[in-house]
Amino acid sequence: MLRRVGRTTCSPAACQLRHTTILSVRKGDTVVLLGDRQVTLGERIVAKSSACKLRRINDDVVIGFAGSTADAISLMEKLENKIGEFPNQLTRAAVELAKEWRTDRALRRLEASLIVCSAEETLEIDGQGNVITPEADGIVAIGSGGTFAKAAARALIDVDGYDAEKIARKAMRIATDIDVFSNEHWDVEVLKRKSEKQEGSEASAKTSE
């Protein structure tokens, strides 16, 4: 487990880092990623539903970000390139991005955190360039409402009849009710792990082509 190191000073971009809620919940064969759409500048809310903080790289990977939008987009583009270099190796791609983030003088100035999900893996890449795997419960959250969202999701994870999406939506509702820098306008991405039968069918289809 990696300890996050707080900064003693805070640039506008770094301050933005906490002004949102991004939550990922994994249960069974499903992983869900939610992000609110509120935009803040410093301590001022400038838009309540205009910013999509989730991005689907391809059919297999989705990313949520907290922080400066421009910085996050730069990092997501870098990660997309790494995923292209290391297909089906999400952890390897994330680690390679983290190495570059730590060593490149320009990248070191970028202020953002990412949650990256595939059907098989969930990772957090923090503002220090660390790659962090979630606890055994598969729940990850970042942003100012992240602590509330994570706590709520953990309380709901074992409730009978609650699938990953229902848990995530309920936890997100609780978090955004508490956190003034997050709101009830969300984007949602869902990925499902393919069964062996589905993978076999797809492989057969490709072979026949």
From Swiss-Prot:
A single GO molecular function term of this UniProt record: threonine-type endopeptidase activity
Transit peptide: first to last position: 1-19
Biological processes, Gene Ontology terms: mitochondrial DNA replication; proteolysis involved in protein catabolic process; rolling circle DNA replication
Catalytic activity of the protein: ATP-dependent cleavage of peptide bonds with broad specificity
Designated name of the protein: ATP-dependent protease subunit HslV
Function comment: Protease subunit of a proteasome-like degradation complex. HslU recognizes protein substrates and unfolds these before guiding them to HslV for hydrolysis. HslV is not believed to degrade folded proteins. The HslVU protease complex functions in mitochondrial DNA replication by regulating DNA helicase PIF2 protein levels.
Protein's cellular compartments: Mitochondrion matrix, Kinetoplast
Annotated effect of mutating T20A: Strongly impairs peptidase activity
EC numbers: 3.4.25.2
SUPFAM superfamilies linked: N-terminal nucleophile aminohydrolases (Ntn hydrolases) (SSF56235)
InterPro entries xref list: ATP-dep_Prtase_HsIV_su, Ntn_hydrolases_N, Proteasome_sua/b, Proteasome_suB-type
Keyword set, alphabetical order: Hydrolase, Kinetoplast, Mitochondrion, Protease, Threonine protease, Transit peptide
Biological source species: Trypanosoma brucei brucei (strain 927/4 GUTat10.1)
